[in-house]
Amino acid sequence: MLIWSPKGRAAAGVVASVLFIVFFFLPLAVILMSSLSQRWNGILPSGFTLNHFVNALHGAAWDALLASLTIGFCASLFALLCGVWAALALRQYGVKTQKWLSMVFYLPSAIPSVSVGLGILVAFSQGPLQMNGTLWIVLTAHFVLISAFTFSNVSTGLARISADIENVASSLGASPWYRLRHVTLPLLMPWMVSELALSLSLSMGELGATVMIYPPGWTTLPVAIFSLTDRGNIADGAALTIVLVAITLLLMMKLERIAKRLG
């Protein structure tokens, strides 16, 4: 503990609680109240209704939910596959080479998502790899944005697996493929599932790049929320935000529970 005195720890706890309430709880509470409000002309809503949630689960909003889940799972699974492959491949190199190659994987996380979206839009709007107006361009953008986090988490998991375990399997005659399937991947599985949860949450909430490249029929929840609030439909946008937060949290909790069970 950096704070040794009981009074100091109590004060730090109070400050942390106040900051949590002000910057996390209150905004969500306001969004929830807005999603349930009939009219909000004063300090508090003057009436409550569930119509905004009904709107959030029908029509274009429901299509946006399905699109977000489809894009999120597809991009996250592909990023996980590539992240595991890259992390395993980098183990064959020296420390200095690993450092420089890791920087290449971390680079997308340092670039604003709007810049990533613009770059992908320009790169894949013409030529043999034209993807503009298709689902593939959205999947590409989401993959680029979450791949760095996937690689980082999987690399951390690999670093915590003792090399002695694989060496013992090798000394017993296990082939590299057998070691990978029956030793390395099972030990890495909790990290992989945990990373899948993180990637899915990042993809579900992505807006900056998606709003520049999404094709008709593949409007995601963040884009739908932005469109609703931009048109002044705050209540429906708030209801859709609550749906997005709830589904993302439920998926993360389920995947984290699976990860703990595997661990």
Curated annotation (Swiss-Prot):
GO CC annotation, single: plasma membrane
Sequence intervals crossing the membrane: 13-33, 69-89, 104-124, 131-151, 185-205, 233-253
Domain ABC transmembrane type-1: 65-253
Gene Ontology biological process terms, A to Z: transmembrane transport
InterPro entries: AminoethylPonate_ABC_PhnV (IPR017661), MetI-like (IPR000515), MetI-like_sf (IPR035906)
PROSITE patterns assigned: ABC_TM1
SUPFAM superfamilies in the cross-refs: MetI-like
Pfam families: BPD_transp_1 (PF00528)
Compartments in which it is found: Cell inner membrane
Membrane topology: Multi-pass membrane protein
Keywords: Cell inner membrane, Cell membrane, Membrane, Transmembrane, Transmembrane helix, Transport
Reported function: Probably part of the PhnSTUV complex (TC 3.A.1.11.5) involved in 2-aminoethylphosphonate import. Probably responsible for the translocation of the substrate across the membrane.
Record-stated family: Belongs to the binding-protein-dependent transport system permease family.
Protein name listed in UniProt: Putative 2-aminoethylphosphonate transport system permease protein PhnV
Taxonomic lineage: Bacteria, Pseudomonadati, Pseudomonadota, Gammaproteobacteria, Enterobacterales
Gene name tied to this protein: phnV
